[in-house]
Curated annotation (Swiss-Prot):
Disulfide bonds: none annotated. ATP binds at residues 400-407. GO terms for molecular function: ATP binding; DNA replication origin binding; helicase activity; hydrolase activity. It comes from the Viruses. It comes from Acanthamoeba polyphaga mimivirus (APMV). InterPro entries: P-loop_NTPase (IPR027417), Replication_origin-bd (IPR003450). This is Uncharacterized putative helicase R8. Belongs to the mimivirus R1 family.
Length: 1052
């Protein structure tokens, strides 16, 4: 058959080449086909005329050599269709369920047509193609459904989820009727569903009538009667009805209109409903794998970070080669285009199979316009799409690796389309400085260079923190005025959306939610929007779809996915500090040009000390660096190439594009935990350097999570459970029940549009985009935990097409090269010696706003606000101040926790956003509950510190209280939901409180949580009687913090 087609029509090696070869006006008259050519998933593509002689052209439908698949090109007509799949352990169970489920689904389809489309169809209008049969581990139900009446044709125009008039609507409607049809997220915990969601996407494909499974040639798709379920013998003319993309225009054709709000009901369920997550990436992968290896089990990960699998039933045929293997397992590698299965057998070397998607954004990206080019403007499709966007689109989104010409693309847009009013939103000062250096000749004004209201300027670069400066208040008409911009640009959109989690956005009169919703309204009334990034997550997807919805564009956003991958990098990660330092300084002494990317500012300072001794020319950028360095970032290429060593901390995550061929090698220092950046931001830091002489990046990660296997081999933990959106949403919905108050809410504005300005009036609803993005931000922050960080980092490295390797030791025996220095102690000594009378805080605040502070001035501001936080208004002894700074500097939150827990300050008086305030109230409630149980009191919201000076708890009293805490306390009765409040890793205590040795895990948790709130539970004494030990314990507040707080409030 395939040879016949090759004689009749041109064969294409890529889908896009085939599609582009057919003018849009001609596509409805063609049949688009693909067929596999080898076991690694490669296909050829062809186009033939869509006419009544289709089957006579391809001839016999019984040959096992046929593997044709229909392709439904986006924008062309296709009939309603479904793909039914299910697995059974035996043929008996298959036959029993087959007779039940198929008639049930057919009847539900008839119901959907009546209810959703107001169309009456009969049983005979629902056509069935059966490919069910024996699989390697039981029996598989496989039936394709096509709704194709003889006297008329129903059709949709696409198969994407987020679109009008889509075939996905039938699937969504059916699983709304019966949740049994939907695949469950965890393959192992619940029965598999029946309807396959994977067949609904851009340019979807399905096997056609008579087509067989590749490469075995078995289980051909045969027509069966929808009533008797018996096999049918059809003529070529009758078979045309079973072709999904064959639309007979001689019959009446009816478009099935499907509003977006209806079709997306199911796909958005995860965001709307209070259901905790039931899976993690490992379970999702196992779900995908079991479709091809039903007896598969996961066995950890390889050194390269791949996911290893094996299978029990050795009669299962390898899906790559069609042969059986006696012992070989297989593995899955995750890329940005999805998950691919590969086999360890030499017989399958070089072969792979695309399994599907794990990340929720993968399909969204896959449905974008696909290009593969080193520089965006080199692809002829890009200028064409720009024209389409200018003529009829709102949003232009680009996913493209760093260094692929996104900046030049924006210059091209500004040059060609002469857009007069442009707002460029940033999230980092370094990004703003770099962009200003590149675009100041276009007339842009940087918010960093003016203190005035930005409303008067037509082209503005502004950081989110200062976004409110673009509006002007009309005091005469009592209105706020905002320009209607021709274009809004958000470069590095992921970082921008993540920035809304910053606590610095929350002020007494405004918070991050308000700023975010203001940004959305500005974009809504602008003419055009561009968003760009090297990576796109669910946050950006939600953002793009929301803008599309509120501007009534209905799917008119244009997105480009540039799959071009620059040179592959290999990240070699070690926990051997001595080896890392040895290699680093050996390269510096060899006069190599080195870049050090560090997640720790302290590590940068430590290296700087050694470089000063060596007389090495270097520059380091941290948050504490002199602000004058930021000016040099406007011409970073010229500035950095003058240095032998360049070091930077997370103060430079985005915006810098160093394009010179200068650096020989890169070294990285990785740090996990709450006080540093997330894995995505770390890789953004690495990406600032576009060219490296050596693509092998050596990384030191002291906290790397490991375990020792039976052979004493050190194994990195790459598959820890991660927090998900569903986790956080379910926890917040639970928290809301505690106080009967909404935490996740919606604040929107009623808008009044004028010719050049917009005015806003507040209005409330129930849930909004900010909450969705905020929860995803919080997930990202929680997954910085030491046990989870590497799991996320490994995924991101693999998805980017890079490699990861490990060089681990049990103990670092090497003598340190660098002297031990205490950066914090040195910093405190400098602050102690500063003469406060020589500094004017108002003047320094102005310099801070203008980015003109020196390192010493930054330290004075830090000292000033530390003393203010502790209520120190008068001169204080230097030794006393040093003692306080040593204990509480950068830990001032302990003071505020004390103030709130003991009633000195209200939570409502803090500058946190409303969500954080509600979390603080719940945490306070948990601590109060612990104390009440321990001492037998009934405090409500606050404790009394005067009565917690030193309460003695006898052994019997403590034992009873501990048992009650484990069984009944607010925290331990639902620990899994409260862990994220205290930034603990996902999971719950598995210890058995009935076993004495395991009670210590509950005890340590109790002691630690109380200590975080300045309450000390400790053993005062131990007594042994008749060989049995008893303990006397005490509960008290931290006396030093108590004294600080009392002093602060006594002098107000």
């Amino acid at each position: 058959m395939i040879k016949k087609i090759m004689k009749m029509a041109k064969i294409y090696k890529s889908k896009n080449a085939m599609i582009d070869a057919v003018p849009v006006i001609d596509r409805e008259s063609k049949m688009f086909l693909q067929y596999p050519v080898n076991s690694n998933g490669c296909c050829n593509f062809t186009v033939i005329d869509k006419d009544k002689d289709f089957f006579s052209n391809i001839k016999s439908t019984k040959s096992n050599s046929k593997f044709l698949q229909e392709m439904f090109i986006d924008g062309t007509k296709r009939k309603p269709y479904l793909d039914i799949e299910h697995y059974y352990p035996s043929e008996k169970e298959f036959k029993k369920d087959f007779k039940r489920i198929i008639p049930q689904i057919v009847n539900d389809i008839i119901q959907v047509f009546a209810k959703e489309y107001d169309q009456v169809i009969k049983l005979s209008d629902v056509l069935l193609l059966n490919s069910s049969g024996q699989s390697s581990d039981g029996y598989k139900l496989s039936v394709h459904v096509v709704v194709s009446p003889k006297n008329k044709t129903f059709y949709y125009t696409n198969s994407k989820k987020i679109e009008n008039n889509t075939a996905y609507h039938l699937y969504a409607s059916l699983i709304n009727i019966n949740s049994e049809y939907k695949d469950k997220e965890n393959f192992n915990d619940k029965p598999h569903g029946y309807l396959d969601e994977q067949v609904y996407r851009k340019d979807a494909t399905l096997r056609m009538i008579g087509s067989c499974k590749y490469p075995t040639g078995d289980r051909c798709l045969d027509p069966i009667d929808s009533k008797t379920l018996e096999k049918l013998d059809l003529t070529d003319k009758q078979k045309l009805n079973y072709l999904i993309s064959y639309i007979d225009d001689t019959k009446p054709t009816i478009l099935l209109e499907t509003p977006i709000i209806q079709q997306t009901t199911i796909s958005k369920t995860k965001i709307q409903h209070n259901e905790p997550t039931k899976t993690n990436i490992n379970n999702k992968l196992l779900d995908l794998v079991k479709k091809y290896h039903p007896s598969a089990k996961q066995y950890g990960s390889s050194k390269e970070g791949y996911y290893n699998f094996n299978y029990d039933n050795r009669t299962e045929k390898c899906p790559l080669s069609g042969v059986t293997h006696d012992s070989n397992g297989f593995y899955v590698i995750e890329k940005s285009s999805g998950c691919f299965l590969k086999c360890y057998s030499k017989k399958c070397h070089g072969k792979s199979m695309h399994l599907g998607y794990v990340d929720e954004t993968d399909q969204f990206v896959d449905e974008a316009h696909q290009i593969n080019t080193k520089y965006l403007l080199q692809d002829p499709l890009v200028p064409k799409l720009l024209e389409d966007w200018i003529n009829k689109g709102k949003t232009f989104a680009i996913k493209s690796a760093m260094g692929t010409g996104k900046t030049y693309l924006i210059k091209h847009i500004l040059d060609k389309y002469k857009l007069n009013k442009v707002l460029w939103i940033t999230h980092r000062q370094t990004l703003t400085k770099s962009l200003y250096g590149s675009f100041k000749d276009y007339g842009f004004v940087s918010y960093m260079d003016t203190q005035n209201c930005l409303y008067q300027y037509d082209k503005v670069l502004v950081q989110i923190d200062s976004l409110m400066r673009i509006k002007e208040f009309d005091m005469f008409e009592n209105k706020q005025l905002v320009k209607k911009y021709d274009l809004v640009i958000i470069d590095e959109i992921e970082g921008c959306l993540s920035h809304y989690e910053s606590p610095y956005l929350n002020k007494p009169d405004i918070d991050s939610r308000y700023i975010f919703n203001f940004m959305i309204d500005v974009i809504r009334f602008s003419n055009k929007l561009i968003v760009l990034d090297a990576d796109i997550s669910i946050r950006t997807q939600l953002f793009i779809e929301h803008i599309d919805k509120i501007t009534n564009k209905g799917g008119n956003y244009i997105m480009i996915n540039n799959s071009y991958q620059p040179i592959t990098k290999t990240f070699t990660i070690t926990n051997d500090e001595g080896d890392f330092d040895t290699k680093l300084f050996a390269d510096i002494k060899a006069k190599k040009n080195i870049c050090v990317v560090s997640m720790s500012a302290g590590a940068v300072n430590k290296i700087a000390v050694e470089l000063n001794k060596m007389g090495t020319k270097y520059v380091s950028h941290t948050s504490k660096s002199n602000d004058s360095l930021k000016k040099n970032l406007e011409d970073v290429n010229n500035f950095w190439k003058q240095q032998q060593v360049v070091m930077f901390s997370p103060s430079i995550i985005s915006g810098i594009d160093f394009n010179e061929i200068h650096f020989d090698k890169m070294y990285c220092i990785i740090k996990s935990g709450n006080k540093t950046c997330d894995p995505r931001s770390f890789l953004q830091m690495v990406g600032r350097i576009r060219h490296l002489g050596d693509q092998n990046i050596f990384c030191w990660y002291q906290q790397i999570p490991i375990f020792i296997d039976k052979t004493n081999k050190i194994i990195p933990k790459l598959q820890s459970d991660v927090y998900t959106f569903d986790d956080l949403l379910s926890y917040y919905r639970y928290y809301e029940t505690l106080r009967n108050k909404k935490i996740i809410k919606n604040v929107v504005y009623e808008t009044v549009e004028g010719d050049d300005v917009i005015s806003f009036v507040n209005k409330s609803v129930e849930i909004d985009l900010f909450d969705k993005i905020s929860l995803h931000n919080e997930v990202e922050q929680l997954n910085k935990h030491q046990d989870v960080f590497l799991t996320v980092l490994n995924r991101l490295i693999m998805r980017a097409g890079n490699k990861i390797d490990f060089k681990l030791v049990l103990k670092d025996d090497k003598k340190p090269i660098m002297d031990k220095i205490n950066n914090r102690e040195e910093e405190i000594n400098i602050m102690i010696d500063l003469d406060d009378s020589k500094y004017d805080i108002k003047e320094l605040s102005t310099k801070q706003t203008n980015n003109q502070l020196t390192e010493i001035e930054k330290l004075f501001i830090k000292k000033y606000y530390f003393k203010k936080k502790l209520g120190i208004k008068k001169e204080i002894d230097k030794d006393k101040l040093r003692e306080l700074m040593t204990k509480y500097m950068d830990k001032e939150y302990f003071i505020e926790r004390y103030e709130i827990l003991f009633g000195y300050k209200k939570i409502s008086d803090s500058n946190d956003d409303s969500k954080t305030k509600e979390k603080d109230r719940i945490k306070r409630k948990i601590i109060v509950d612990f104390v009440n149980i321990l001492i037998g009191k009934h405090y409500n919201n606050c404790l009394n510190d005067s009565k917690l000076k030193r309460i003695i708890i006898k052994d019997d009293q403590y034992s009873k209280a501990l048992k009650k805490i484990i069984k009944e306390s607010m925290y331990f009765s639902n620990e899994e939901k409260y862990r994220p409040l205290f930034r603990k890793k996902k999971g719950s205590l598995k210890s058995n409180p009935k076993k004495e040795k395991e009670i210590q895990f509950y005890t340590s948790t109790l002691v630690r949580l109380l200590r975080e709130y300045n309450i000390i539970l400790k053993v005062e004494s131990r007594k042994k009687t008749n060989g049995k030990s008893s303990y006397l314990r005490s509960l008290s507040v931290d006396k030093q913090i108590k004294d600080v707080v009392e002093n602060k409030y006594n002098h107000q």
